[in-house]
């Protein structure tokens, strides 16, 4: 739902939601990407998976509202965490129930996720080949707890990071089998 459910109205999902991720990969590798292979599908956010009796908008009395993970009332009215992304011009502490109800009543953010005319993938994997035979696999997936994670595997060790403000980067070196935690500052 929202701005990116339909390619004709926005862009393909990898461009709309993950172009900065692929830019970061290019920067980290420091080489030109020479080949790309991609697989992706829209398998879940489709009309056929809509709960029985689900209306066009969640606020219109959906019979599945109580147990729906994507209930717009829960996501935007009851908890303003995601609302701040939709209304970035309004300070988080000034987001009100009235603003949230307006969003879910009058924008695509209030539509049932299964009834949004979705035509973009809900998961996609890219296999990329860079110069010097560096290979990268990137996965964009709607079915997770949110966030960005990176795992770099090299000949001398590996690096793992959750790209947020609180989780340290972990560097593991094979020679001494040690982990180093690098705080995010």
Predicted region positions:
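Predominantly a Rossmann-like dinucleotide-binding segment in NAD(P)-dependent oxidoreductases
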Residues: 1-110
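Glycine-enriched catalytic-core subsegment of oxygenase/oxidase enzymes
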Residues: 110-185
């Amino acid at each position: 739902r929202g701005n990116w459910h339909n390619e004709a109205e926005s862009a393909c999902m990898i461009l709309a939601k993950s172009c900065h991720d692929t830019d970061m990969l290019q920067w980290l590798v420091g080489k030109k990407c020479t080949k790309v292979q991609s697989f992706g599908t829209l398998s879940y956010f489709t009309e056929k998976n809509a709960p029985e009796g689900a209306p066009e908008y969640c606020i219109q009395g959906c019979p599945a509202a109580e147990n729906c993970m994507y209930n717009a009332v829960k996501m935007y009215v009851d908890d303003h965490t995601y609302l701040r992304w939709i209304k970035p011009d309004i300070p988080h502490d000034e987001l009100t129930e009235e603003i949230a109800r307006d969003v879910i009543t009058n924008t695509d953010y209030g539509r049932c996720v299964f009834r949004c005319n979705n035509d973009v993938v809900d998961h996609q994997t890219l296999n990329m080949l860079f110069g010097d035979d560096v290979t990268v696999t990137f996965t964009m997936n709607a079915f997770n707890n949110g966030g960005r994670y990176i795992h770099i595997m090299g000949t001398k060790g590996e690096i793992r990071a959750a790209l947020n403000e609180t989780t340290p980067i972990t560097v593991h070196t094979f020679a001494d089998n040690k982990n180093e935690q690098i705080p995010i500052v």
